[in-house]
Amino acid sequence: MNAVEKNRYTEAWQAFGLAHHRPRAVLCVSAHWYTGETAVTAMERPRTIHDFGGFPDELYQMSYPAPGDPDLATEVADLLGASVSPDAVALDRSWGLDHGAWSVLVHSWPEADVPVLQ
């Protein structure tokens, strides 16, 4: 619900976005993405995922059309894999951004113009 509410949390996320320079990209780690492997999203345009149920329609209508960055995703996968094994991190081109990511980012960077990896 924080995605559509105004409260101390959403105000803090908004203040964070205003107080910091626009980042090159954002890497989100979400507890809502269950995989059998470590993976990072690697598509140009990740879709907004509504991975929840029983909430007001307003929440299901929200979209966070931030771009992805496949080249950066490859770099992240390589860096993480270097500490484990070269193929330890998969590049995922199907998932998108779940509400663990976009419900926060919609307040910090509402223009959705910062590339996001998850």
Residue ranges and their predicted role:
Residues M1-L79, S83-V84:
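A short aromatic-anchored loop/beta-hairpin motif
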Residues L72-Q118:
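Internal, conserved structured core segments that host functional sites
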